[in-house]
């Protein structure tokens, strides 16, 4: 990940020895003041990564199998699953290598570990950027399908979707390579934070606008059928609750990680910030949790995809 030297975990593992860590403890900073440090067990981290890996592999397999799902919307969902798969897979790979280094089962030179670290960092960073981009792309696709319903199939065509997907992957890989190469520069970390905030604002604006249009549509139906207003109010409350959950999960899972990046720039030596830095793996775990939740929100709610998924599972048995 694009962190300063303190977060280069693979290199640090070369000279480390296996130690037992509690699940929750107080770590002291350099002044002796206690810091709340939450230690995520490697087993839990790997288990969450494995769940994410299996979920997203199933989504990709189901979409690839069913030609009816080869539409622009499902292409974006498939790419989101693929990028989430790479997020969890790269973090699992890094954790596995750390465990092997700490156990002495993997003996190698520091230069080799540095190259491996850089490769994993680029893979992780590019997959995270892709994941954020495809979340934004799905929001844009849904927005166009609602506000330009009659022209949707002429606006969002499969060739355009493929070009957008290719552009996102290429831009993410190139950007992450530059980010890792210049990760010690504050401007790089600020760019990542600004990018996250831009995606958050984009999704919030689009989904709020879509909710407002849906409420207007429900109100029109209510007037047409002369139903009472509470039915419309109930629809608005359900829509607001769904929107709150959608954006809340996105912010809670991704926000702490980008807050960490921002604090690295703003207060790298501050005592409170130093305490927050100690919980870096917690922030990564939240991102892994988001890769588990994404298929539940964007993929498994589709009946067509779920039917195909059952076929894939039955064929595998």
Swiss-Prot record:
Pfam families: 7tm_1 (PF00001). SMART domains: 7TM_GPCR_Srsx. InterPro entries: GPCR_Rhodpsn, GPCR_Rhodpsn_7TM, Melcrt_ACTH_rcpt, MSH_rcpt. A lipid is attached at residue 315 (S-palmitoyl cysteine). SUPFAM superfamilies: Family A G protein-coupled receptor-like. Its main location: membrane. GO terms for cellular component: plasma membrane. GO terms for biological process: adenylate cyclase-activating G protein-coupled receptor signaling pathway. The chain crosses the membrane at residues 38-63, 73-93, 119-140, 164-183, 192-211, 241-266, 280-300. Keywords: Cell membrane, G-protein coupled receptor, Glycoprotein, Lipoprotein, Membrane, Palmitate, Receptor, Transducer, Transmembrane, Transmembrane helix. Glycans are attached at residue 29. Residues 1-37, 94-118, 184-191, 267-279 are extracellular. Residues 64-72, 141-163, 212-240, 301-317 are cytoplasmic. It is found in: Cell membrane. It is a multi-pass membrane protein. The keyword Transmembrane helix applies. One of its GO terms (molecular function) is melanocyte-stimulating hormone receptor activity. Interacts with MGRN1, but does not undergo MGRN1-mediated ubiquitination; this interaction competes with GNAS-binding and thus inhibits agonist-induced cAMP production. Interacts with OPN3; the interaction results in a decrease in MC1R-mediated cAMP signaling and ultimately a decrease in melanin production in melanocytes. This is Melanocyte-stimulating hormone receptor. It comes from Alouatta caraya (Black howler monkey).
């Amino acid at each position: 990940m694009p962190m300063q030297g303190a977060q280069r975990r693979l290199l640090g593992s070369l000279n480390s020895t296996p130690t037992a860590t509690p699940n929750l403890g107080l770590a002291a900073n350099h002044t002796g003041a206690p810091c709340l440090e939450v230690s995520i067990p490697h087993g839990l981290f790997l288990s969450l990564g494995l769940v994410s890996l299996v979920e997203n592999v199933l989504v990709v397999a189901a979409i690839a199998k069913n030609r009816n799902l080869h539409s622009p919307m499902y292409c974006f969902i498939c790419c989101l699953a693929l990028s989430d798969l790479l997020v969890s897979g790269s973090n699992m790979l890094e954790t596995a290598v750390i465990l092997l280094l700490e156990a002495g089962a993997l003996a190698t030179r520091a230069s080799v570990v540095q190259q491996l670290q850089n490769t994993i960092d680029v893979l992780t960073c590019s997959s995270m950027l892709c994941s954020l981009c495809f979340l934004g792309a799905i929001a844009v696709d849904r927005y166009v399908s609602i506000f330009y319903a009659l022209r949707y199939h002429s606006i969002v065509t499969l060739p355009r979707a493929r070009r957008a997907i290719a552009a996102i992957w290429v831009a993410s890989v190139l950007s992450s390579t530059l980010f890792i190469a210049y990760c010690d520069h504050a401007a790089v970390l600020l760019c990542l934070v600004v990018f996250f905030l831009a995606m958050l604002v984009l999704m919030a604006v689009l989904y709020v606008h879509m909710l407002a249009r849906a409420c207007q549509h429900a109100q029109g139906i209510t007037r047409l059928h002369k139903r009472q207003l509470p039915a419309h109010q109930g629809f608005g409350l359900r829509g607001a609750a769904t929107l709150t959950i959608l954006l809340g999960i996105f912010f809670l899972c991704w926000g702490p990680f980008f807050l960490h990046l921002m604090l690295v720039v703003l207060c790298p030596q501050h005592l409170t910030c130093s305490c927050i830095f100690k919980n870096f793996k917690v922030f990564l775990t939240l991102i892994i949790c988001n890769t588990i939740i994404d298929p539940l929100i964007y993929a498994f709610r589709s009946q067509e995809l779920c039917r195909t998924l059952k076929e894939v599972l039955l064929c595998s048995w």
